[in-house]
């Protein structure tokens, strides 16, 4: 008699009662936890996408449109780590909003103001969370 399972052949009259390969036992699995973005992370993703579109409009010489007022939520959005919401962050957030407002208030110099806004993002991320910096740098208009 020949038994097979789990791609392993078992000889006649063999006893492998505790052999996990023969029994096809699966190791205990850790519970999978789905990552959910904090409201701040979601806002930053939204701002990145919007600024990427804004970059394209500036390069094409199109209208920049109106200042997206939801950006001011950067002051109140819940962060992944609330200890990051300190004086440095608040100062950098204010600089970012000012740079963003200038893009729309002075469209003739939109490229300069846009690049200043990108620089303000990088300055903040250098002090808080460096991970997104390479991605943010791609926003610069050359």
Features from the language model and the residues they span:
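C-terminal motif of bacterial Sec signal peptides marking the signal peptidase cleavage site
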Residues: 3-5
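Extracytoplasmic c-type cytochrome modules immediately beyond a signal peptide or single-pass transmembrane anchor
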Residues: 10-117, 133-142
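The canonical Cys-X-X-Cys-His
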Residues: 117-129
């Amino acid at each position: 008699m020949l038994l097979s399972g789990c791609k392993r052949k078992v000889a006649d009259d063999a006893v492998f009662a505790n052999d996990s390969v023969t029994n096809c036992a699966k190791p205990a699995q850790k519970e999978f936890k789905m990552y959910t973005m904090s409201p701040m992370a979601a806002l930053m993703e939204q701002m990145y996408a919007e600024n990427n579109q804004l970059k394209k409009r500036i390069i094409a010489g199109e209208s920049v449109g109106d200042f997206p007022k939801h950006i001011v939520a950067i002051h109140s959005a819940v962060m992944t780590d609330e200890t990051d919401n300190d004086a440095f962050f608040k100062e950098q957030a204010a600089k970012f909003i000012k740079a963003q407002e200038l893009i729309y208030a002075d469209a003739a110099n939109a490229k300069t103001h846009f690049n200043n806004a990108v620089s303000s993002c990088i300055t903040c991320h250098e002090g808080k969370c460096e991970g997104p910096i390479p991605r943010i740098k791609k926003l610069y208009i050359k």
